[in-house]
Regions:
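Catalytic domains of carbohydrate-active enzymes that cleave complex glycans
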Residues: 1-20, 105-194
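Catalytic-core regions of glycoside hydrolase
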Residues: 1-105
Length: 194
C-alpha cells in the first residue's frame, strides 16, 4: 500500500529499503540492500544492473562475522567490500557513522548492542582502525570495478579470471577459522599487482 501511495504522488520517486529480500516489492525499489547471507537471484541482479538500480548488502548486530564491532578483526571491515565485489554488488551499507553512546571514548557499547555497532569514528575528528579498514575495502572495491570494466572492454579474459580467482576465498562462514586479515592481505597483494 505504501508503494502505491508513493507512486500516485510521484511515479519517479526513488525508494530505498534495507531489509530482507522480498520478491514482490523488489521491482519498485531503486536502492535495495539485503542482509548479508541472503542473495539476489542472479537474473534479478543482472536486471537491476541494466536498470541502473543500486543493489547492496548490509550487516547488523546479528552477524558475528564479518562485522565492524570494536572487538571485530579490523580486516573484516575491508573484507566486506571484497565480498561485495565477489557478489557483483554495488557496495556495502554501514548503518551508523557517528551515533555515539554517552561516553564513546570510555565504553563503546550501546544498551545490549555490541560495542562499536553505533559508530565508526570518534568525537573530535578521531578516526579508528575499523573506519580506515572500511575505506581500504571501498577503495579495493572501486579498483576492482574499474579493472573489470577495462578488462571487459579490452577482452582481457585472463585479467577477469585473475580477479574472480582473487575473490573466490571471500566466503561467508570461513571466519573465524580463516581470519579476515589472511584473506584480505592475499587479495591486496594480487590487486596491487595490477
Amino acid at each position: 500500500k505504501t508503494l502505491k501511495v508513493i507512486r500516485k504522488a510521484d511515479p519517479d520517486f526513488k525508494v530505498s529499503l534495507a531489509g530482507n529480500y522480498h520478491e514482490e516489492i523488489e521491482p519498485d525499489l531503486y536502492d535495495y540492500c539485503i542482509v548479508i547471507g541472503q542473495n539476489f537471484p542472479e537474473e534479478v541482479r543482472l536486471r537491476r544492473v541494466a536498470e541502473n538500480k543500486r543493489t547492496n548488502y548490509y550487516t547488523c548486530c546479528t552477524e558475528a562475522h564479518p562485522n565492524t564491532f570494536t572487538f571485530s578483526d579490523p580486516a573484516e571491515a575491508a573484507w566486506m567490500s571484497y565480498y561485495s565485489s565477489k557478489k557483483h554488488l554495488d557496495g556495502y551499507l554501514r548503518w551508523a557513522y557517528n551515533s555515539w553512546p554517552l561516553e564513546p571514548l570510555l565504553d563503546s557499547r550501546f544498551r545490549s548492542w555490541a560495542g562499536g555497532d553505533t559508530y565508526l569514528v570518534y568525537p573530535g575528528a578521531r578516526s579508528c582502525i575499523r573506519f580506515e579498514r572500511l575505506i581500504e575495502g571501498i577503495q579495493a572495491h572501486e579498483k576492482i570495478n574499474i579493472l573489470r570494466q577495462e578488462f571487459e572492454k579490452k577482452g582481457n579474459k585472463a585479467g577477469l579470471k585473475k580477479i574472480e580467482k582473487m575473490l573466490a576465498p571471500f566466503n561467508l562462514g570461513s571466519m573465524p577459522e580463516i581470519p579476515a586479515a589472511v584473506t584480505v592481505n592475499r587479495a591486496n597483494q594480487i590487486l596491487n599487482s595490477f
